């Protein structure tokens, strides 16, 4: 990785973490049982797909730490790790989807929608509740209800906000890439 790339990634992580935190605090809709529909979940998916798994990991990690600290006064480390992990996993197909140089087609939208559904079920539907049961000994019914609501709310947030963000970003950059190719010919 060149020096310019590492600087760009660092700046992207810093700015995206700030946006993640602001969205977590001010753009979430409570649905009950300490669960909210968070636009920050859709933003994390967008950032990870646009910039790759390492950026997704750090935005999920740092953003969730700051959010927990400011909103709750303490950090739930198992959930922070789940946010970091899902940010990383969301970013794995970033070269396949390639928002910057290829159109975000319906096929890619469906592919990533199914992919993020599977990721949400694995991370928030399995790992997060299991870690709550093992670490905190919380009541299983409450833990699984929360995890089910989180999975559904993340899927809804991505379906409404994430797809729009990715489509707008892709349209903007693919037009620029096409213009650059035309100008260089």
Swiss-Prot record:
Its main location: membrane. Belongs to the UPF0397 family. It comes from Aster yellows witches'-broom phytoplasma (strain AYWB). GO terms for cellular component: plasma membrane. Pfam families: ECF-ribofla_trS. It is found in: Cell membrane. Keywords: Cell membrane, Membrane, Transmembrane, Transmembrane helix. This is UPF0397 protein AYWB_013. It is a multi-pass membrane protein. Disulfide bonds: none annotated. HAMAP family: UPF0397. The chain crosses the membrane at residues 13-33, 42-62, 69-89, 109-129, 148-168. The keyword S-adenosyl-L-methionine does not apply. InterPro entries: ECF_substrate-spec-like (IPR009825), UPF0397 (IPR022914).
């Amino acid at each position: 990785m060149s020096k310019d790339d590492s600087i760009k990634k660092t700046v992207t992580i810093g700015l995206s973490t700030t946006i993640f935190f602001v969205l977590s605090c001010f753009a979430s809709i409570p649905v009950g049982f300490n669960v909210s529909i968070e636009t920050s979940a859709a933003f994390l998916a967008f950032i990870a797909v646009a910039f790759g798994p390492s950026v997704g990991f750090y935005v999920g990690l740092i953003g969730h730490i700051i959010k927990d600290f400011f909103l709750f006064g303490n950090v739930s480390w198992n959930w922070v790790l789940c946010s970091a992990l899902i940010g990383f996993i969301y970013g794995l197909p970033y070269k396949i989807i390639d928002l910057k140089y290829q159109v975000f087609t319906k096929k890619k939208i469906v592919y990533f929608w199914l992919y993020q559904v599977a990721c949400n079920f694995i991370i928030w539907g399995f790992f997060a509740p299991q870690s709550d049961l093992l670490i905190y000994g919380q009541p299983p019914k409450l833990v699984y209800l929360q995890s089910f609501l989180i999975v559904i709310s993340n899927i809804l947030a991505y379906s409404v906000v994430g797809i729009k963000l990715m489509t707008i970003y892709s349209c903007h950059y693919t037009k620029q890439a096409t213009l650059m190719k035309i100008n260089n010919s």
